[in-house]
């Protein structure tokens, strides 16, 4: 074969002939093909990315948001925290729902939410409350670091780690007292009339039991303060204890329980309801309903119980799910005051970066199809709390003296009457009779007998009233007296009304859920 067969001839327009080696011709062709493919792929990728960006940026509902974000980033007179802008825009979007139960949670808020779900936190283990401008220990938790360090009910906290907390709220104080397990915190406290003293407490992991049980005058009292992980198991254990104690009547107490995990509530209902029974419905915005049924056999220990459920304006959400189910499916008796009325359910979505979105996605209805939202559950036996539960908190800086006339004066009269002092008429006028009564109170407590309610007198009145309320649970006592046959339903309702005729009873529907949660002044520390 001749050498010319290994060459390819090419003719240019001018007519010149160029001889190209065939091997290099193939290399050139392959290189051109590869380059073309790469360029095409890059072009497609760029075009695709551009299409995505254009598709997002040109959505009309986001155009203002992008314009504001870009304008601030480009023109604000100082450096901008872009992450803060994004976080606040998400917060604003959720707030735009105008739904008190939907919220976006950042890292810190998510940690608090998880504490409410698990019942675990790191701190000293004490309950505190606001009393005027003071932060008071109401109770150290049993076995807690606070109890082991000698903290007692009534101790006033005046400083934390040498930082004065004068004028602080309980929430602000709690944030300072809490801390990592194994670390120390120094509380400066005042006990009674004593001098301030420092108490060093080593923080630990604290678990808040959601269910407590006690037997009172032959009646089992099971109190549930929240629906968290493990509440159903705790509840079952307490019911079994009541059965072993031989009680026939049991009170399930949901007062001031704001709700929590729905599946825990369903499992608790299952203690009294047979398997495969519908205990509530979930309804989506299109009207489609999903039945939620029990999955296990009922607890044999509950078969012989006479069931009473105690609720009030702070009983919401999962508390109402439980109460509504037993109201529809059993002969349980509901007592107390009308519940809060939260008939919607929230779902959570993790968003990354330790943030979470909680939003309302369904309504819930009782087994009979009742939607209690905004209405609450009306008890069979209405048991309103006595007037002293509604006394206005007295500010020690204010002075109430003879001749003053306002609603707070009536609160002072109710408080002193509750503590055993004769106040005469329950009107709004600070008269000579009240001056004499205040002097008697001051004499009994070795305070200067001015007859005015201010300073130490105001503080002592509120302190003694708190102690009285803590040791006299009126609604619970009313119900136990009725169960034990001392009063009929009508008689116990009338008696409760007689003790609640001087201070206005607010409509619970005017409360927000946060109000219901805050109604109990104690805060787990």
Listing of model-derived features with the role each one plays in the protein:
Residues 127-141, 221-223, 390-395, 404-418, ...:
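PDZ/PDZ-like groove recognition
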Residues 157-158, 185, 372, 416:
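Generic structural signal for buried aliphatic residues
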């Amino acid at each position: 074969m001749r050498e010319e067969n290994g060459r390819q001839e090419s003719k240019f327009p001018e007519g010149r002939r160029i001889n190209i080696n065939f091997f290099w011709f193939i290399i050139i062709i392959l290189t051109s093909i590869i380059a073309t493919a790469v360029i095409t792929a890059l072009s497609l990728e760029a075009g695709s990315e551009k299409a995505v960006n254009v598709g997002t940026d040109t959505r009309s509902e986001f155009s203002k948001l992008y314009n504001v974000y870009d304008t601030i980033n480009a023109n604000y007179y100082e450096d901008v925290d872009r992450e803060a802008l994004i976080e606040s825009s998400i917060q604003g979007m959720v707030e735009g729902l105008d739904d008190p139960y939907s919220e976006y949670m950042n890292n810190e808020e998510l940690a608090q939410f998880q504490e409410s779900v698990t019942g675990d936190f790191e701190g000293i283990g004490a309950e505190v409350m606001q009393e005027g401008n003071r932060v008071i220990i109401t109770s150290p938790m049993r076995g807690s670091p606070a109890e082991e360090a000698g903290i007692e009910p009534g101790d006033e906290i005046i400083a934390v780690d040498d930082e004065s907390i004068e004028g602080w709220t309980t929430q602000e104080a709690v944030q300072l007292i809490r801390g990592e397990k194994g670390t120390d915190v120094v509380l400066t406290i005042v006990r009674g009339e004593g001098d301030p003293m420092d108490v060093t407490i080593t923080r630990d992991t604290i678990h808040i039991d959601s269910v407590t049980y006690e037997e009172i005058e032959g009646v089992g009292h099971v109190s549930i303060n929240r629906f968290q992980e493990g509440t159903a198991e705790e509840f079952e254990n307490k019911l079994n204890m009541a059965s072993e104690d031989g009680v026939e009547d049991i009170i399930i107490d949901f007062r001031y329980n704001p709700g929590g995990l729905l599946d825990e509530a369903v499992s608790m209902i299952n203690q009294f309801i047979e398997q495969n029974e519908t205990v509530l419905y979930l309804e989506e915005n299109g009207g489609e309903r999903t039945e939620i049924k029990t999955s296990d056999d009922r607890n044999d220990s509950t078969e012989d119980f006479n069931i009473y459920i105690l609720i009030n304006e702070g009983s919401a959400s999962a508390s109402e799910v439980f109460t509504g189910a037993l109201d529809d499916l059993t002969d349980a008796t509901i007592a107390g005051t009308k519940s809060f009325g939260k008939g919607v359910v929230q779902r959570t979505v993790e968003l990354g970066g330790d943030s979470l979105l909680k939003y309302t996605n369904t309504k819930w209805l009782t087994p009979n199809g009742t939607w209690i939202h905004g209405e609450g559950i009306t008890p069979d036996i209405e048991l309103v709390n006595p007037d002293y539960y509604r006394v206005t908190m007295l500010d020690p800086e204010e002075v109430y003296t003879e001749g003053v006339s306002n609603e707070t004066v009536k609160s002072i009269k109710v408080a002193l009457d509750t503590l055993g002092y004769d106040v005469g008429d329950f009107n709004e006028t600070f008269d000579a009779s009240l001056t004499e009564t205040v002097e008697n109170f001051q004499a009994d407590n070795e305070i200067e007998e001015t007859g005015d309610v201010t300073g130490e007198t105001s503080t002592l009145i509120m302190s003694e009233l708190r102690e009285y309320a803590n040791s006299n649970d009126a609604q619970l006592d009313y119900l136990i007296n009725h169960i034990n046959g001392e009063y009929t339903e009508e008689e116990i309702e009338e008696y409760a009304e007689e003790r609640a005729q001087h201070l206005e009873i607010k409509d619970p529907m005017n409360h927000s859920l946060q109000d219901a949660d805050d109604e109990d002044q104690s805060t787990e520390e």
